[in-house]
Amino acid sequence: AGHAVTVFERADRIGGLLRYGIPEFKMEKRHIDRRLEQMTAEGTEFRTKVNVGVDLPVERLRAEFDAVVLAGGATAWRDLPIPGRELDGIHQAMEYLPRANRVQLGDPVVDEHGEPPITAKGKKVVIIGGGDTGADCLGTAHRQGAVSVHQFEIMPRPPETRAPSTPWPTYPLMFRVSSAHEEGGERVFSVNTEEFVGRDGRVTGLR
C-alpha cells in the first residue's frame, strides 16, 4: 500500500536546514538521525550528494517517478546593501551557521569550496537582526569564544506582555529571551545600520 518514496539531497547528509542551519545546542542532531532511521525502516530511500537539475536532469525525474515534490529549503539570504558591505569580516548567517555545524559534526575544517570555517574566537561580534537566526548566531559565537557579542534589532523593544495589536490567536508580539540570550551578550533595539567602516579592507565598526 502507499507509494515508494525517494528523497534527493544536495548535501552529504539528510536533514537540510534542520541539520546545518540550526545549532546543536538548540536541536540535537540525534533526533534527526532517529527520525531518519524510522523513515528508512519504513521504506523511504534517501540519496545524498545529488543536485537536481545539475547531477540529475529534471526530465529524468519526471520520466522515472509518478510525482515530483519540490521541498528545497530557502537558503537565499536577504542582504544589507549599504556602504562598506564588501569589507572582509562581514558574513551572512547562512554562511556562518552551516560551517559551524559541520565542525560540530566532525567534518573537515574546510567546506566544498575550500574555505575554512568562520570563527568568532577572540573577536568582538555584532549580529544584525534580532530574530531566532540572530540568537542562533549569538549562541554559536559564545561557544566559539567570542570576546563580546552585541545583537542589533531595527525594531523597538517589544512589550513584556501581549500587545493589543496581536490578540489571540495571532502570534504574540512580546519580548522573549532565548536560551542563547541567557548565556550573555547585549541586545540593542531601534538600531538601523547605515554603513560598515573598515581599515585595510577589513571591517572595524559600523554606523
Residue ranges and their predicted role:
Residues 28-78, 85, 95, 102-115, ...:
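A Rossmann-like FAD-binding core segment of flavoenzymes
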Residues 118-131:
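Beta1/beta-strand and adjacent pyrophosphate-binding region of the FAD-binding site
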Residues 1-7, 133-144:
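N-terminal Rossmann-like FAD-binding beta1-loop-alpha1 element of flavoenzymes
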Residues 21-26:
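Short glycine-enriched, charge-decorated loop/helix-capping segments at active-site entrances
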Residues 19-20, 80-84, 138-140:
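Short amphipathic alpha-helical segments
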Residues 3-19, 148-161:
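Glycine-rich FAD pyrophosphate-binding loop
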